[in-house]
Amino acid sequence: MAELLKWYVDSGVDVALEDAPVNRLDQAPPEAAPASAPPATERSGAAGPPPRQRPDQKLVSREETHQSAREAAAKAANIEELRAALDAFDGCPLKETAKNLVFGDGDPKADLMFVGEAPGAEEDRQGLPFVGPAGHLLDKMLEAIGQSRGDVYITNILPWRPPGNRSPTDAEIAACLPFIERHIELVGPKILVMVGGTSAKTLLGITQGIMRLRGKWLSYESVHMASPIEARAILHPAYLLRQPAQKRETWLDLLEIRANLETGA
């Protein structure tokens, strides 16, 4: 008997045989498990998802934001009041994610004013414009034409950093536009240098790219200024760090800016 059991085990039989034959094909199928109860639904009186905002509602909201910005900027009689107005302005969502307001740096009565696009990570940390790698290159560019950061005035279209250094949206630019326009009016520079394509297109209200705008004198106008300001568009230092071969073109722009400052032409 022991030898028979051993043979069964060696053959792979690991269950005991029934005393009587069993027709397993004739067995009733196992009962199906009861269906799980559907997830509980909200009570009929519970609030559903918020209704979608209609496009016309968004447009009205944006116009109200722009109007609020225009009114706040117009009330600023000097640079300090404009900074306070921007600090109190809640119409741009970038303020919620930024660490600091990046307002401006340099001489607010300078003949030469630089306007970039938006702060980067280092600018956001320090609360000053153009202090990262691109800012260091801008400092060298200024030195090359006999200027320093203290001789000029530097700011941006946007005073708050977009998350992840992404490009600003049209809505964000529109919300901040009245403030940069008032900023330029209060500084009243002899020459306005628009740093990068976003700055140039925003301030001039055009769609041409920076490569078509650089290399020539332009004109910046404001309804609140007695006369237009001579303007120049240059490649952004951040772009020059990525494309150093373009530094020559920017150097030619800087030479013309210097000549204009020296001769008053």
What are these model-derived regions, one by one?
Residues 2, 7-10, 14-26, 30-265:
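A polyanion-binding, active-site-adjacent surface
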